[in-house]
From Swiss-Prot:
Residues 251-263 have a biased composition (Polar residues). This is Transcription factor prr1. SUPFAM superfamilies: CheY-like, Winged helix' DNA-binding domain. One of its GO terms (biological process) is regulation of transcription by RNA polymerase II.
Amino acid sequence: MPSSNGSSDFVRKLFNMLEEPEYRHILRWSDSGDSFIVLDTNEFTKTILPRHFKHSNFASFVRQLNKYDFHKVRHEEGAPSIYGEGAWEFRHDDFQLHHKDLLDNIKRKAPSKRNLANENTAPVIENLKQQVDSILDFQKLLDRNLSGLATSYQTILLKMFELKRGIESRDLLMSSIISYLCDLEGSTQRQANPGAMFVPSHPLQELLNAYQALAKGQVATTSPQQIPNQIQQASAATTASSKMTVDTNLGTAQPSLYNTPSSDYELANQEKPADSMASAASLNTPLSSNDHSLNPHAHGSYPMYEKFQPIQHPNPGSFTTHLDSNASMAKSFSQISNDSLAKASSVATSMSQMGAAVPTTGLWKRQPRILLVEDDELSRRMTIKFLTSFDCQVDVAVDGIGAVNKANAGGFDLILMDFILPNLDGLSVTCLIRQYDHNTPILAITSNISMNDAVTYFNHGVTDLLVKPFTKLTLLQLLKKQLLNLLQADNSINMSDVPSTKEAKDDKAPVTFYLENDAPMYPQQMLQDPIQADLQHPH
């Protein structure tokens, strides 16, 4: 019968078989009676195991004996067994001949501590697996939520950018209206009393004071904001493309609203930000070639206009649109003198000669790093070929978002960018870059550009223009102009060949842009920084 600690039927059955003479030729007691011997393991496996024990092989029977603490008797090494070569002898202290009463002491061994530990750790391991699965599921949920938050964040950024552009457009419209009112009132006063100095009326002065106070408050709370690298996500790229396209269409539909600098980029770089905001009133004055009386500068300098300072480009080493307060703003492009055009042509000719004389190797103190943003493969290959021949390191972006990401990484000496790009247009890219980088020159590659477009580009952070199609020499001259700090001393541009600022003022015929055969020409591509220009609206 089985005991409380394990069944002893196996032991009793084995003892009874040893008592029977039927199996003595296979299984018997030892001569001393304190052990038993399996004489023939093969016969034991074939005859006894299938009939009396539930074991299929002798090894399983031996394992069963070990569970009841039977041990195999090992003879001295090399000594033959007295019961034959294939005999197996097993012993247990309570398994002896004629001592059946001791069989109750033979119990099945308790599981080892190792097995017990394994059994105890199984539930723990299963519990840990469940916890890991729960953590993985929770992580997936967090990833989905984070992705949604990132998308929402990008959408909010674009909405904020659109709102900012809308506020800028509103401010420019307000400044244009105020400027028009000033001109209208000044014209009325001059018609009544031509020799009198213009003094704004009380309502107009209150309007000007209120606008200046509003401008001061906006400048005080405005600061450049970093554009994050999350724009590199492909999902946000599509959103950015559609949003910026709408934004660009807004700027195209209302070109008059972008005729003066108004972004945070320009405001943050003014010594007198309040005056800079107020100066929009004088810069947005509507001009007509047939009516010069609306322009106060044509009739002397009035105190109200003297405090409106021209907005300067934040990079003094790059191209800037200069305004000469002593020149007449009533002059239209059709009235530019032949002497002015000849002077601009002489500057371009002298610069072309100097550029041709400079070799394209050994130009730089170190290799300039250029970011080229161009989606057209043919133009990109040609420009890269030119730049590498000038010993420049070139990195390439093929769309607007890629350009923002690479510019955000920094380390570029100059950005050469086509303004017709996928995902983000060049103007939007420039506005984004200028919010955290005010110094790197940005050269716009463009063609068929109008005067309003050119002014818009400069007002929003573009340093200079490179008009298609351009030559290798033109590109080299523009690089030398914008990267003067990297030029070797013997390759520096000779400033004596360029008319001085004083001479330009005395001639009163400075030229920034002029039109030839309905196509804009840009002498400032060569070297126009020392020349102050009058921006005039053509007919």
